[in-house]
Amino acid sequence: MTTRLTAWGVTGIGEIKPDDQLGDIIVAACRNEPNGPLLDGDVLVVTQKVVSKAEGQLVAIDPTNPLSHKQLVEDEAVRIVRRRGDLIITETKHGFVCANSGVDLSNVERGQAALLPKDSDRSARRIRDIVRAQLGVEVGVIVSDTFGRAWRKGLTDVAIGVAGIAAVVDLRGTADALGRVMQVTEVAIADELASAAELVMGKSSGIPVAVVRGADPGWFREASVSELVRPPQEDLFR
């Protein structure tokens, strides 16, 4: 475990457009960071929106017709979980259960909607590989997005893609502070790091990338965000 984490938003990213080389842009911004260069063991958290923009995951919708957005949400879903008014909870092609299939109208031009990246693990790996090649450091990369929670109000950022950092840290079989063996404890470490990073990025500050420093060395490994998706046979509410 770690007893100290520090996090800061990376400034100077600017507006991202389709076909921009996001990894190169992030590296350039990190070179100019007043907090100093990236170090081995840092974690880069990158918001889904800039990843989707760079990868061209933008589609045109009719902003005057609510049915246009609704149809797009349904097209991006493999299953409709719940409906209430304009809100639709869906399961996406990635296995995520979230509002509106992750289709987002915020921070994009009117008449556009941003879709989730096709493969956010791959997106994270690309950024990680560019950082490694250009800066010579080994970092973890998390692609984050904002999700609601079924049983609690409010939004929080979670991981939808990872590279070089665990999605889940399995503590089953280890002892707690009183020596009892833990039977079910699996920590969603990538989600926790994504949430920590969101505190220094915000929703409207124009800072889409953050660095988290101080992660436990044991968290770094090759992984996939699919580790966070609960299998249907284990889901009590499906």
PLM region spans:
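A structural signal for small-residue-enriched, beta-sheet-centric alpha/beta enzyme cores
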Residues: 2-14, 48, 58-111, 115, ...
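Phosphate-interacting basic helix/loop segments used at nucleotide- and nucleic-acid interfaces
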Residues: 20-36, 118-135
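N-terminal, positively charged regions that mediate nucleic acid binding
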Residues: 2-62
